[in-house]
């Protein structure tokens, strides 16, 4: 869990490029104090001079993002919108800030990874004056991927071609939960994930009971070469190929997994196979405990009924 740093004015004079806000004593909860810091973070910053030192700007943005961890989400998004509105007056400055935001919120090494927070910076970078064609294309791809695969959003209804050549829509499938596995047949890490998931007793038990469906999607065409490569994939998985998914899905973390509910809403992503297996084990154990408790209560009810029936029988 990330800690929010509260900094005294004396410390700020020597450690920061400008004076950070100090929450009033009337704000006592962590969320309220964090929200105040986020809302007023840039109040004393000279927006012209801060960009003269990239090091100072990076450190300031690092602190800014760290305060967001416990802040109110509406306050956070409003603060980002106001910041972008101010910085966007200069195209080069906006591109610099978008680049730093990408490193701190979106990249593989991002300390505060957050798709929701990065998205407005990506949009601002894509529309900044002076942005190159290459930069704009890169931002637009990230925007498309993120907007279509945010947690809490409906997963795109892509067309799937199965091993037998039949074509279906992703949203055609019914079930309680879905594990979408974006597969690359020749990749070693993907192969290891397939082996672990296909041999996991907990997941297979949930599949058999109809609790979870695994949909394994290879981005690309469903040609004969693909069919040969996936011929030995688990028969209790829905194995498909789908074109155009690279534009729709965020696949920074590979192997890529998405976990959906029955309405095809994304519950989680950037999952790891080992963590999935542990989660499925816990779900299965929980279901077993519930089933055992129901059976115990049922047996107790039957015993009580038998006792009542015996008491109601007339004595000879």
Where are these regions (language model features)?
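Structural microenvironment flanking redox-active thiols in thiol-disulfide oxidoreductases
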Residues: 191-231, 244-247
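Thiol-/selenol-based redox modules, centered on thioredoxin-like
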Residues: 259-316
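Short acidic, S/G/P-rich loop/turn micro-motifs used as interaction or catalytic elements
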Residues: 68-70, 104-106, 185-189, 221, ...
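Short, internal strand/loop/helix patches
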Residues: 227-263
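Structural beta-sheet core signal
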Residues: 97, 214-216, 259
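Active-site proximal loops enriched in glycine and acidic residues that flank catalytic Cys/His/Asp
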Residues: 181-184, 216-221, 241-244, 261-262, ...
């Amino acid at each position: 869990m990330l800690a929010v740093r509260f900094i005294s004015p004396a410390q700020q004079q020597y450690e920061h490029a400008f004076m950070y806000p100090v929450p009033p004593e009337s704000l006592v909860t962590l969320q309220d104090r964090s929200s105040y810091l986020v809302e007023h973070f840039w109040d004393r910053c000279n927006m012209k001079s801060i960009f003269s030192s990239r090091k100072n700007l990076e450190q300031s943005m690092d602190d800014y993002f760290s305060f967001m961890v416990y802040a109110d989400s509406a306050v956070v998004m409003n603060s980002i919108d106001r910041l972008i509105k101010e910085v966007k007056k200069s195209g080069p400055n906006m591109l610099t800030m978008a680049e730093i935001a990408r490193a701190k919120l979106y990249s593989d090494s991002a300390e505060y990874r957050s798709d929701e927070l990065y998205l407005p910076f990506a949009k601002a970078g894509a529309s900044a004056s002076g942005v190159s064609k290459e930069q704009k294309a890169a931002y637009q791809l990230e925007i498309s991927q993120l907007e279509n695969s945010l947690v809490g959003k409906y997963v795109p209804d892509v067309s799937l071609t199965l091993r037998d050549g039949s074509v279906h829509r992703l949203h055609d499938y019914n079930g309680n939960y879905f594990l979408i596995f974006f597969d690359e047949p020749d990749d070693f890490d993907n192969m290891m994930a397939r082996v672990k998931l296909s041999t996991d007793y907990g997941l297979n038990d949930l599949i058999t009971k109809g609790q979870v469906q695994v949909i394994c999607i290879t981005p690309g065409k469903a040609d004969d070469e693909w069919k040969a490569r996936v011929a030995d994939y688990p028969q209790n998985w829905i194995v498909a190929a789908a074109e155009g998914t690279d534009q729709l899905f965020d696949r920074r973390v590979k192997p890529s997994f998405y976990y959906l509910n029955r309405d095809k809403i994304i519950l989680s992503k950037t999952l790891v196979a080992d963590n999935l297996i542990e989660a499925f084990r816990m779900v299965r154990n929980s279901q077993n405990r519930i089933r055992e408790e129901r059976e115990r209560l049922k047996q107790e009810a039957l015993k009580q009924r038998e006792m009542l029936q015996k008491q109601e029988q007339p004595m000879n």
